[in-house]
From Swiss-Prot:
Protein name: Elongation factor Tu
Compartments, record wording: Cytoplasm
Gene: tuf
EC number: 3.6.5.3
UniProt keyword Protein biosynthesis present: yes
G4, as annotated region: 137-140
This protein's GO CC annotations: cytoplasm
Keywords: Cytoplasm, Elongation factor, GTP-binding, Hydrolase, Magnesium, Metal-binding, Nucleotide-binding, Phosphoprotein, Protein biosynthesis
Protein backbone atom coordinates (compact mmCIF):
# COMPACT_ATOMS: atom_id res chain seq x y z
CA UNK A 1 0.00 0.00 0.00
CA UNK A 2 1.43 3.36 -1.02
CA UNK A 3 2.06 5.80 1.81
CA UNK A 4 -0.28 8.78 1.91
CA UNK A 5 1.54 12.05 1.36
CA UNK A 6 1.53 14.36 4.38
CA UNK A 7 -0.50 17.42 3.46
CA UNK A 8 1.43 20.51 4.51
CA UNK A 9 -1.13 23.00 3.23
CA UNK A 10 -3.16 22.57 6.42
CA UNK A 11 -1.92 24.00 9.67
CA UNK A 12 -0.95 21.46 12.32
CA UNK A 13 -1.68 21.35 16.05
CA UNK A 14 -0.98 18.90 18.87
CA UNK A 15 -3.85 18.26 21.25
CA UNK A 16 -4.96 15.66 23.77
CA UNK A 17 -7.84 14.51 25.93
CA UNK A 18 -7.59 15.11 29.69
CA UNK A 19 -9.98 14.47 32.59
CA UNK A 20 -11.05 12.06 35.34
CA UNK A 21 -10.83 8.29 34.94
CA UNK A 22 -13.90 6.77 33.20
CA UNK A 23 -15.35 10.10 32.13
CA UNK A 24 -14.92 9.05 28.49
CA UNK A 25 -11.58 10.40 27.22
CA UNK A 26 -10.75 7.34 25.13
CA UNK A 27 -14.32 6.90 23.86
CA UNK A 28 -14.27 10.55 22.76
CA UNK A 29 -10.92 10.07 21.01
CA UNK A 30 -12.38 7.08 19.13
CA UNK A 31 -15.54 9.05 18.30
CA UNK A 32 -13.60 12.01 16.88
CA UNK A 33 -11.53 9.77 14.56
CA UNK A 34 -14.62 7.81 13.49
CA UNK A 35 -16.98 10.74 12.87
CA UNK A 36 -14.37 12.81 10.98
CA UNK A 37 -13.33 9.81 8.87
CA UNK A 38 -16.96 9.05 8.02
CA UNK A 39 -17.47 12.59 6.74
CA UNK A 40 -14.29 13.16 4.72
CA UNK A 41 -12.86 9.69 4.15
CA UNK A 42 -9.53 11.05 5.40
CA UNK A 43 -7.56 9.74 8.37
CA UNK A 44 -8.34 6.42 10.05
CA UNK A 45 -11.34 5.55 12.19
CA UNK A 46 -10.00 4.06 15.42
CA UNK A 47 -11.95 1.72 17.70
CA UNK A 48 -11.90 2.15 21.48
CA UNK A 49 -9.71 -0.90 22.10
CA UNK A 50 -7.19 0.14 19.42
CA UNK A 51 -6.59 3.31 21.43
CA UNK A 52 -6.94 1.78 24.89
CA UNK A 53 -4.27 -0.85 24.29
CA UNK A 54 -1.57 1.81 24.03
CA UNK A 55 1.93 0.33 24.15
CA UNK A 56 4.30 1.38 26.91
CA UNK A 57 7.03 3.75 25.81
CA UNK A 58 10.12 4.87 27.62
CA UNK A 59 10.75 8.59 27.58
CA UNK A 60 13.88 9.74 29.46
CA UNK A 61 13.81 6.49 31.40
CA UNK A 62 10.20 6.92 32.48
CA UNK A 63 7.63 4.30 31.48
CA UNK A 64 4.56 5.90 29.91
CA UNK A 65 1.60 4.43 28.03
CA UNK A 66 0.28 6.83 25.41
CA UNK A 67 -1.91 6.41 22.37
CA UNK A 68 -1.17 8.70 19.44
CA UNK A 69 -3.88 9.18 16.82
CA UNK A 70 -4.20 11.64 13.97
CA UNK A 71 -7.18 13.14 12.21
CA UNK A 72 -8.09 16.23 10.23
CA UNK A 73 -10.85 18.80 10.06
CA UNK A 74 -11.58 21.09 7.08
CA UNK A 75 -8.87 23.50 8.19
CA UNK A 76 -6.37 21.58 10.30
CA UNK A 77 -4.38 18.43 10.82
CA UNK A 78 -4.22 17.15 14.41
CA UNK A 79 -1.93 14.84 16.34
CA UNK A 80 -3.91 13.72 19.37
CA UNK A 81 -2.64 11.98 22.49
CA UNK A 82 -4.73 9.92 24.89
CA UNK A 83 -3.41 8.10 27.97
CA UNK A 84 -4.97 5.05 29.59
CA UNK A 85 -4.05 5.76 33.20
CA UNK A 86 -3.90 8.80 35.46
CA UNK A 87 -0.20 8.25 36.24
CA UNK A 88 0.50 8.25 32.49
CA UNK A 89 -1.04 11.72 32.18
CA UNK A 90 1.02 13.08 35.03
CA UNK A 91 4.25 11.74 33.53
CA UNK A 92 3.32 12.73 30.00
CA UNK A 93 2.50 16.32 30.84
CA UNK A 94 5.52 16.88 33.06
CA UNK A 95 8.13 15.28 30.80
CA UNK A 96 6.67 16.93 27.71
CA UNK A 97 6.70 13.54 25.99
CA UNK A 98 3.54 14.73 24.29
CA UNK A 99 3.53 18.50 23.93
CA UNK A 100 0.03 19.93 23.78
CA UNK A 101 -0.98 23.19 22.08
CA UNK A 102 -4.39 22.72 23.66
CA UNK A 103 -6.47 20.11 25.44
CA UNK A 104 -10.01 18.76 25.41
CA UNK A 105 -11.16 18.42 29.01
CA UNK A 106 -13.70 15.59 29.22
CA UNK A 107 -16.16 15.81 32.12
CA UNK A 108 -18.99 13.33 32.65
CA UNK A 109 -22.23 15.30 32.89
CA UNK A 110 -23.60 12.54 35.12
CA UNK A 111 -20.81 12.95 37.70
CA UNK A 112 -19.51 16.50 37.37
CA UNK A 113 -15.90 17.52 38.10
CA UNK A 114 -13.92 14.93 40.11
CA UNK A 115 -10.47 14.99 41.82
CA UNK A 116 -8.51 14.16 38.64
CA UNK A 117 -10.48 16.80 36.73
CA UNK A 118 -8.99 19.33 39.12
CA UNK A 119 -5.54 17.77 39.04
CA UNK A 120 -5.39 17.73 35.23
CA UNK A 121 -6.41 21.41 35.11
CA UNK A 122 -3.70 22.29 37.64
CA UNK A 123 -1.13 20.25 35.69
CA UNK A 124 -2.18 21.96 32.45
CA UNK A 125 -1.60 25.32 34.11
CA UNK A 126 1.78 24.33 35.55
CA UNK A 127 3.20 22.69 32.44
CA UNK A 128 1.94 25.41 30.10
CA UNK A 129 -0.97 23.88 28.17
CA UNK A 130 -2.29 27.22 26.88
CA UNK A 131 -5.90 26.45 25.90
CA UNK A 132 -8.65 24.13 27.13
CA UNK A 133 -11.95 23.27 25.40
CA UNK A 134 -14.56 21.38 27.46
CA UNK A 135 -16.59 18.38 26.33
CA UNK A 136 -19.44 17.51 28.72
CA UNK A 137 -19.84 13.81 28.02
CA UNK A 138 -22.65 11.31 28.73
CA UNK A 139 -25.31 14.02 28.26
CA UNK A 140 -27.65 11.30 26.94
CA UNK A 141 -27.82 10.03 30.54
CA UNK A 142 -28.95 13.36 32.00
CA UNK A 143 -32.55 14.42 31.35
CA UNK A 144 -32.48 17.49 33.56
CA UNK A 145 -31.38 20.59 31.60
CA UNK A 146 -30.77 22.48 34.86
CA UNK A 147 -28.38 19.80 36.06
CA UNK A 148 -26.36 20.15 32.85
CA UNK A 149 -26.15 23.90 33.37
CA UNK A 150 -25.02 23.35 36.94
CA UNK A 151 -22.22 21.00 35.87
CA UNK A 152 -21.16 23.47 33.17
CA UNK A 153 -20.97 26.27 35.77
CA UNK A 154 -18.93 24.06 38.09
CA UNK A 155 -16.43 23.29 35.33
CA UNK A 156 -16.16 26.96 34.34
CA UNK A 157 -15.55 27.96 37.98
CA UNK A 158 -12.90 25.28 38.34
CA UNK A 159 -11.08 26.52 35.22
CA UNK A 160 -11.21 30.12 36.48
CA UNK A 161 -9.78 29.00 39.82
CA UNK A 162 -6.63 27.92 37.96
CA UNK A 163 -6.42 31.10 35.86
CA UNK A 164 -7.97 29.74 32.68
CA UNK A 165 -10.67 32.06 31.23
CA UNK A 166 -13.57 29.98 32.58
CA UNK A 167 -16.23 32.34 31.25
CA UNK A 168 -14.91 32.23 27.67
CA UNK A 169 -13.92 28.59 27.32
CA UNK A 170 -16.12 26.74 24.78
CA UNK A 171 -18.24 24.02 26.42
CA UNK A 172 -19.84 21.42 24.12
CA UNK A 173 -22.46 19.00 25.46
CA UNK A 174 -22.53 15.56 23.86
CA UNK A 175 -22.26 11.81 24.11
CA UNK A 176 -19.10 10.19 22.78
CA UNK A 177 -20.60 6.71 22.95
CA UNK A 178 -23.77 7.64 21.01
CA UNK A 179 -21.65 9.43 18.39
CA UNK A 180 -19.38 6.39 18.10
CA UNK A 181 -22.48 4.22 17.57
CA UNK A 182 -23.43 6.45 14.61
CA UNK A 183 -26.36 8.41 16.07
CA UNK A 184 -26.58 11.49 13.80
CA UNK A 185 -27.86 13.84 16.51
CA UNK A 186 -24.81 13.11 18.69
CA UNK A 187 -22.39 12.98 15.73
CA UNK A 188 -23.31 16.63 15.15
CA UNK A 189 -21.97 17.38 18.64
CA UNK A 190 -18.57 15.98 17.67
CA UNK A 191 -18.46 18.40 14.70
CA UNK A 192 -19.47 21.19 17.07
CA UNK A 193 -16.61 20.20 19.39
CA UNK A 194 -14.06 20.13 16.56
CA UNK A 195 -15.28 23.52 15.26
CA UNK A 196 -14.66 24.88 18.76
CA UNK A 197 -11.18 23.32 18.83
CA UNK A 198 -10.40 24.71 15.34
CA UNK A 199 -11.46 28.21 16.33
CA UNK A 200 -10.48 28.48 19.99
CA UNK A 201 -7.04 26.83 19.95
CA UNK A 202 -4.77 29.04 17.82
CA UNK A 203 -2.28 27.57 15.38
CA UNK A 204 0.98 27.29 17.31
CA UNK A 205 3.88 29.45 16.24
CA UNK A 206 6.44 27.22 14.53
CA UNK A 207 9.82 26.84 16.19
CA UNK A 208 11.53 28.54 13.25
CA UNK A 209 9.49 31.73 13.78
CA UNK A 210 10.48 32.14 17.44
CA UNK A 211 13.54 34.16 18.56
CA UNK A 212 16.86 32.35 18.06
CA UNK A 213 18.19 30.12 20.81
CA UNK A 214 20.86 27.40 20.80
CA UNK A 215 22.18 25.47 23.82
CA UNK A 216 25.98 25.22 23.67
CA UNK A 217 27.17 21.60 23.60
CA UNK A 218 30.84 22.03 22.81
CA UNK A 219 33.37 24.80 22.31
CA UNK A 220 36.66 24.82 20.43
CA UNK A 221 38.98 27.38 18.94
CA UNK A 222 40.15 27.52 15.35
CA UNK A 223 43.55 29.16 15.08
CA UNK A 224 43.37 32.45 13.24
CA UNK A 225 39.57 32.40 13.05
CA UNK A 226 38.26 32.44 16.59
CA UNK A 227 35.98 30.43 18.83
CA UNK A 228 33.29 28.05 17.60
CA UNK A 229 30.28 26.97 19.68
CA UNK A 230 28.45 23.87 18.51
CA UNK A 231 24.93 22.69 19.27
CA UNK A 232 21.45 22.07 17.93
CA UNK A 233 19.37 25.16 17.22
CA UNK A 234 16.37 24.84 19.55
CA UNK A 235 14.30 27.59 17.97
CA UNK A 236 14.43 30.47 15.52
CA UNK A 237 17.04 31.19 12.88
CA UNK A 238 20.55 32.61 12.93
CA UNK A 239 22.44 34.11 10.03
CA UNK A 240 25.94 35.43 9.50
CA UNK A 241 26.21 38.94 10.95
CA UNK A 242 23.54 38.42 13.64
CA UNK A 243 24.24 39.68 17.13
CA UNK A 244 23.73 37.06 19.87
CA UNK A 245 24.07 36.92 23.64
CA UNK A 246 25.90 34.24 25.62
CA UNK A 247 23.70 33.49 28.63
CA UNK A 248 24.01 31.61 31.92
CA UNK A 249 26.68 30.33 34.35
CA UNK A 250 28.39 33.74 34.43
CA UNK A 251 27.89 37.00 36.29
CA UNK A 252 26.79 38.84 33.17
CA UNK A 253 25.67 38.13 29.63
CA UNK A 254 28.17 38.75 26.87
CA UNK A 255 27.20 40.03 23.41
CA UNK A 256 28.97 38.87 20.28
CA UNK A 257 28.43 38.61 16.53
CA UNK A 258 28.11 35.38 14.55
CA UNK A 259 30.73 35.58 11.80
CA UNK A 260 30.19 32.12 10.35
CA UNK A 261 27.67 29.27 10.40
CA UNK A 262 28.74 25.74 9.50
CA UNK A 263 26.86 22.48 9.19
CA UNK A 264 28.62 19.20 8.28
CA UNK A 265 31.74 21.24 7.48
CA UNK A 266 29.85 23.31 4.90
CA UNK A 267 29.29 27.04 5.23
CA UNK A 268 25.69 28.21 5.44
CA UNK A 269 24.05 31.62 5.07
CA UNK A 270 21.74 30.79 7.96
CA UNK A 271 20.64 27.93 10.20
CA UNK A 272 17.22 27.22 11.70
CA UNK A 273 15.50 25.17 14.42
CA UNK A 274 16.61 21.54 14.28
CA UNK A 275 19.98 22.15 12.58
CA UNK A 276 23.17 20.94 14.26
CA UNK A 277 25.65 23.72 13.67
CA UNK A 278 28.92 25.34 14.59
CA UNK A 279 28.70 29.11 15.11
CA UNK A 280 31.88 31.16 14.79
CA UNK A 281 31.82 33.99 17.32
CA UNK A 282 33.67 37.29 16.99
CA UNK A 283 35.96 38.41 19.81
CA UNK A 284 35.11 35.58 22.19
CA UNK A 285 37.95 33.70 23.83
CA UNK A 286 37.76 29.97 24.54
CA UNK A 287 37.45 30.77 28.28
CA UNK A 288 34.42 33.04 27.88
CA UNK A 289 31.98 30.39 26.72
CA UNK A 290 31.18 26.89 27.97
CA UNK A 291 28.83 23.94 27.61
CA UNK A 292 25.54 24.61 29.41
CA UNK A 293 25.25 28.22 28.31
CA UNK A 294 22.95 29.25 25.48
CA UNK A 295 23.34 31.56 22.51
CA UNK A 296 20.22 33.65 22.00
CA UNK A 297 18.83 36.69 20.26
CA UNK A 298 19.68 39.61 22.60
CA UNK A 299 17.03 40.43 25.18
CA UNK A 300 14.86 37.35 24.57
CA UNK A 301 15.89 35.09 27.45
CA UNK A 302 17.40 35.90 30.82
CA UNK A 303 19.39 33.88 33.35
CA UNK A 304 17.67 32.91 36.62
CA UNK A 305 18.45 30.82 39.67
CA UNK A 306 15.10 30.53 41.49
CA UNK A 307 11.89 29.02 40.20
CA UNK A 308 8.79 27.01 41.01
CA UNK A 309 8.43 23.69 39.23
CA UNK A 310 6.09 20.77 38.74
CA UNK A 311 8.08 17.54 39.12
CA UNK A 312 7.49 13.82 38.66
CA UNK A 313 9.75 11.67 40.85
CA UNK A 314 10.71 8.36 39.24
CA UNK A 315 9.57 5.19 40.97
CA UNK A 316 12.04 2.57 42.15
CA UNK A 317 10.97 0.35 39.19
CA UNK A 318 11.89 3.13 36.76
CA UNK A 319 15.38 3.27 38.22
CA UNK A 320 14.64 6.17 40.56
CA UNK A 321 15.30 6.56 44.26
CA UNK A 322 14.27 3.83 46.70
CA UNK A 323 13.61 6.29 49.53
CA UNK A 324 11.72 9.58 49.87
CA UNK A 325 13.43 12.98 49.94
CA UNK A 326 12.76 16.03 52.11
CA UNK A 327 13.16 19.81 51.88
CA UNK A 328 16.78 20.99 51.45
CA UNK A 329 17.57 17.94 49.28
CA UNK A 330 20.42 19.01 46.93
CA UNK A 331 20.49 17.04 43.68
CA UNK A 332 21.74 18.11 40.22
CA UNK A 333 19.33 19.83 37.85
CA UNK A 334 20.07 18.96 34.23
CA UNK A 335 19.01 21.76 31.86
CA UNK A 336 19.54 21.09 28.12
CA UNK A 337 23.25 20.31 28.16
CA UNK A 338 24.50 20.68 31.72
CA UNK A 339 24.05 19.84 35.41
CA UNK A 340 23.67 22.57 38.05
CA UNK A 341 23.31 21.83 41.76
CA UNK A 342 20.08 23.11 43.28
CA UNK A 343 18.34 23.15 46.65
CA UNK A 344 14.74 21.92 46.84
CA UNK A 345 12.13 23.50 49.11
CA UNK A 346 8.89 21.54 49.31
CA UNK A 347 5.54 23.35 49.57
CA UNK A 348 3.95 24.00 52.96
CA UNK A 349 2.36 20.89 54.41
CA UNK A 350 4.42 18.52 52.26
CA UNK A 351 6.77 16.70 54.57
CA UNK A 352 8.44 14.44 52.01
CA UNK A 353 8.12 13.16 48.46
CA UNK A 354 7.97 9.45 47.69
CA UNK A 355 9.31 7.80 44.52
CA UNK A 356 6.44 7.69 41.98
CA UNK A 357 4.84 10.92 43.29
CA UNK A 358 4.41 14.24 41.55
CA UNK A 359 4.78 17.50 43.42
CA UNK A 360 5.22 21.23 43.15
CA UNK A 361 8.52 22.56 44.53
CA UNK A 362 10.66 25.67 44.83
CA UNK A 363 14.21 25.34 43.53
CA UNK A 364 17.26 27.52 44.10
CA UNK A 365 20.20 26.83 41.78
CA UNK A 366 23.76 27.63 42.86
CA UNK A 367 24.40 29.47 39.58
CA UNK A 368 22.13 31.24 37.10
CA UNK A 369 21.08 29.53 33.90
CA UNK A 370 18.96 30.50 30.88
CA UNK A 371 15.47 29.36 31.82
CA UNK A 372 11.89 30.46 31.21
CA UNK A 373 8.43 29.19 32.03
CA UNK A 374 7.98 25.86 30.28
CA UNK A 375 11.68 24.89 30.27
CA UNK A 376 12.06 21.15 30.96
CA UNK A 377 14.75 19.59 33.13
CA UNK A 378 15.80 16.31 34.73
CA UNK A 379 16.81 15.84 38.35
CA UNK A 380 19.86 13.64 38.71
CA UNK A 381 21.80 12.08 41.51
CA UNK A 382 25.18 10.54 40.85
CA UNK A 383 24.54 10.51 37.11
CA UNK A 384 21.18 8.71 37.22
CA UNK A 385 17.84 10.41 36.61
CA UNK A 386 15.61 10.51 39.69
CA UNK A 387 13.03 13.03 38.51
CA UNK A 388 11.69 15.01 35.59
CA UNK A 389 10.24 18.49 35.77
CA UNK A 390 9.10 21.67 34.11
CA UNK A 391 9.51 25.29 35.23
CA UNK A 392 6.06 26.69 36.07
CA UNK A 393 7.03 30.15 37.42
CA UNK A 394 10.29 32.09 37.61
CA UNK A 395 10.68 33.57 41.09
CA UNK A 396 14.03 35.37 40.75
Amino acid sequence: MAKEKFDRSKSHANIGTIGHVDHGKTTLTAAITTVLHKKSGKGTAMAYDQIDGAPEERERGITISTAHVEYETETRHYAHVDCPGHADYVKNMITGAAQMDGAILVVSAADGPMPQTREHILLSKNVGVPYIVVFLNKCDMVDDEELLELVEMEVRDLLSEYDFPGDDVPVVKGSALKALEGDAEWEAKIFELMDAVDEYIPTPERDTEKPFMMPVEDVFSITGRGTVATGRVERGQVKVGDEVEIIGLQEENKKTTVTGVEMFRKLLDYAEAGDNIGALLRGVSREEIQRGQVLAKPGTITPHSKFKAEVYVLSKEEGGRHTPFFSNYRPQFYFRTTDVTGIIHLPEGVEMVMPGDNTEMNVELISTIAIEEGTRFSIREGGRTVGSGVVSTITE
